[in-house]
From Swiss-Prot:
Residues 521-551 are annotated as: Type E(+) motif. Residues 552-646 are annotated as: Type DYW motif. It holds the Pfam family E_motif. GO terms for biological process: RNA modification. Gene3D superfamilies: Tetratricopeptide repeat domain. InterPro entries: DYW_dom (IPR032867), E_motif (IPR046848), Pentatricopeptide_rpt (IPR002885), PPR_At4g14850-like_plant (IPR046960), TPR-like_helical_dom_sf (IPR011990). Residues 9-24 have a biased composition (Low complexity). PPR repeats lie at residues 54-88, 89-126, 127-161, 162-197, 207-237, 238-272, 273-307, 308-338, 339-373, 374-409, 410-440. This is Pentatricopeptide repeat-containing protein At5g48910.
Amino acid sequence: MNPTQTLFSPGGNSPASSPASHPSSLFPQINNCRTIRDLSQIHAVFIKSGQMRDTLAAAEILRFCATSDLHHRDLDYAHKIFNQMPQRNCFSWNTIIRGFSESDEDKALIAITLFYEMMSDEFVEPNRFTFPSVLKACAKTGKIQEGKQIHGLALKYGFGGDEFVMSNLVRMYVMCGFMKDARVLFYKNIIEKDMVVMTDRRKRDGEIVLWNVMIDGYMRLGDCKAARMLFDKMRQRSVVSWNTMISGYSLNGFFKDAVEVFREMKKGDIRPNYVTLVSVLPAISRLGSLELGEWLHLYAEDSGIRIDDVLGSALIDMYSKCGIIEKAIHVFERLPRENVITWSAMINGFAIHGQAGDAIDCFCKMRQAGVRPSDVAYINLLTACSHGGLVEEGRRYFSQMVSVDGLEPRIEHYGCMVDLLGRSGLLDEAEEFILNMPIKPDDVIWKALLGACRMQGNVEMGKRVANILMDMVPHDSGAYVALSNMYASQGNWSEVSEMRLRMKEKDIRKDPGCSLIDIDGVLHEFVVEDDSHPKAKEINSMLVEISDKLRLAGYRPITTQVLLNLEEEDKENVLHYHSEKIATAFGLISTSPGKPIRIVKNLRICEDCHSSIKLISKVYKRKITVRDRKRFHHFQDGSCSCMDYW
């Protein structure tokens, strides 16, 4: 018999009074069910004995179907039980609404519908547990109008002072982007009441949750300053408070602030947890703070924090982006490798280090392990092909993505292909590829082609592509700078001046070059012609020494990189103070002989700096790693891992 067909029909002659069949005797067994199939067997016993007419029995079955963990949950089954219940009390309504509100967005919409059905039931009134669930559904689905109506109903039924209801109202307004409404509720229910010292721990913890919700809301809107102001006002903070600040700064691109908040957290009495590590590792990766990343890895192991696919992938990404691919491989090999996220992280690590062959090998092993590639895995694989100049392999994998794995290429996949073709000198094919794209190319696609034009010295196509970009993103400096570079390389200074004038008229500024270097856990940041560092005098002396030694080694500055019509000597002086050269000089005076130097650059490393650092690695017998916007450059003994292809 299928229990869902006759959910409440009595059958057989099982005595209702039998201890073996009485609902209360089966409740512990319900809690021990591992699957819905297990539950259906108990459900069948209830039906045969006629006990499903018992409100308590039906509610217990409903509770398991609707609100147990997601692995056991079956909302369709729960909904059938609910619809056929002879009597529904507030608990039953709350249970089914909660179940749907905790599911995906489509099912959360059903929770809202169920709430309105409940309100039309003249025999049932909502209680303090009803509103939080339906408000969660409104927050998840962005149904602000329904949320406001439910807010009014909460007040009507006397729950305006209930901290549980209020916290979910604030969360709903925050998630829907209505920070003004959230702020009014927050200040009325928290800030004004906070004048009195809280002695009730439960209420105090509830208020901390509200503070965290507000901070998260400001971070979601990109208002990091408002979030920080609230955070600083908190008299007590939970680990979630710290995690919210760290993840918020990271998501908004304020990586130094994220790491700084983490350092503050370390000094206090709240220990970082799993979420802390997952939140701060991306910031550490972007800054290249290897020492802090290694500390986190060790902390996780010593604290018994399980390194699962998500945390493991974050560690792989951190080691890869800090230039230590060997440690990334070590982490990867210790993971179960059952999830595509882990494989994708490792493929990306190989890609940014220019190890295209290893990336392809990793991709093939992933297939052999029975893990289906994701669209992200293909982006990383195509990036590896691009950095390795593997045109045929790139074409094959782009085609295989659709024909074998049935994945629809995203704009990022097309961008990888344009980059691959352009870097390989196939500019006409790259342009044709763009024009035949089934989706409209964005500025990133055209920038990839423009970069290839600059690399290949094709000024004619470069002008055409730059004009497209200037129309598409008129206030972006990229097209102006790239075209200026091409004109400067030809000595066409009148056109360079024209570009500079157009930028000035439109108040467009070039992104300043910036290089970071981590010395003993402290980040040092340098910009072009930077003399603000406390050791500026020593750095300048080292730059002079480097210049002298490189000349003796045969170095000649590549002055076509300078976008100014200057005398040759003046151009050399400009190149002398590029941020990556200053960072390299600082690394040489701040570390012992033979120790590796690691630098992170926010832009693409220029040709002259690339040539210089190759020689510096040979003259000073140092391994120097530079991570620019595109990839890693491992300089050693006068050569670079990119083989001068970047």
